Amino acid sequence: MEKIKIVTDSTCDLPEYIISKFDIEVLPLMVNVKGKSYFDIVDINFKQLSKIMDEENIFPTTSQVTPKRFNDCFAKYLKEGYKIICINMSSKMSGTYQSACIAKDMLESEDVVVIDSLNVTSGLGVLVLKACRLREEGKSFEEIKNEIIETIPHVKSALAFERLDNLIKGGRLSKTAGTIGNLLGIKLILEVKDGEMAIKDKVRGNKKAARVVLDCIKDESMNKEETTLLLNAENDDILPILRQKLIEQENKFIECEVGCVVGAHSGTKACGVFFIEKY
């Protein structure tokens, strides 16, 4: 039986117990704030980062995983006899995928495959979880690679943002539009589309925001064989509604805390759902 190692980056935002359970190798991105650099999740979590951002009124930057770190990781597992499936955040949002490709080319090994998820946070997470499930089922290296690539267009998402301040600071939303949105109580519903964050809807109030996200997770559209991920950035309003809906529909789901890279843009009080649709 093939030894297969699943590798990803820290933007997958999977809980530590899941990472340990499936022995996933997670390479953290760097978070740069106040002249210091931290490994995402390892050295700093979102709650700590959020506190710094609020108190200092600053916005952090992030750095991709370097080719050398991928090279060291791949070389280690190849030496141990593994074949490696590396699934990374969207190439349109970070150079991390390209770093992994450079590392693969340096090693000149056919036993390493690098996949662009065209997603981020729990959208990347659901693909990593599927790869782990397929491995547990005894699927081959080639079968897992092909199934993950086939699944990528079928990952769906909806994220509700309570405040727009961090989107403004991060340049994802104009200052004028964001300020007006905050004043009017407008909630942005975003989705990951074609590898980038896109506005799905604009509504006023938490109830309408919850309704838009709920419409995305209708029972008939979701593949219940796959695990749905419920992403939380300290949200106490919409998240319980989404959780209850998934329980009622008997969906398998895992709750995940947002990491620093995505959380820097979402801010607190955001939440979202990521799943694989039927196809």
UniProtKB/Swiss-Prot annotation:
DegV domain: residues covered? 4-277
User: Annotated Gene Ontology MF terms?
Assistant: lipid binding
Q: Which UniProt keywords apply?
A: Lipid-binding
Q: Which InterPro entries match?
A: DegV, DegV_C, DegV_domain_contain
Cited Gene3D superfamilies: 3.30.1180.10, 3.40.50.10170
Do the record's keywords include Phosphoprotein? no
Q: Which top-rank group of organisms is this from?
A: Bacteria
Under Pfam families, the record lists: DegV
Protein role: May bind long-chain fatty acids, such as palmitate, and may play a role in lipid transport or fatty acid metabolism.
Q: What is this protein called?
A: DegV domain-containing protein CA_C0701
State the organism named in the record: Clostridium acetobutylicum (strain ATCC 824 / DSM 792 / JCM 1419 / IAM 19013 / LMG 5710 / NBRC 13948 / NRRL B-527 / VKM B-1787 / 2291 / W)
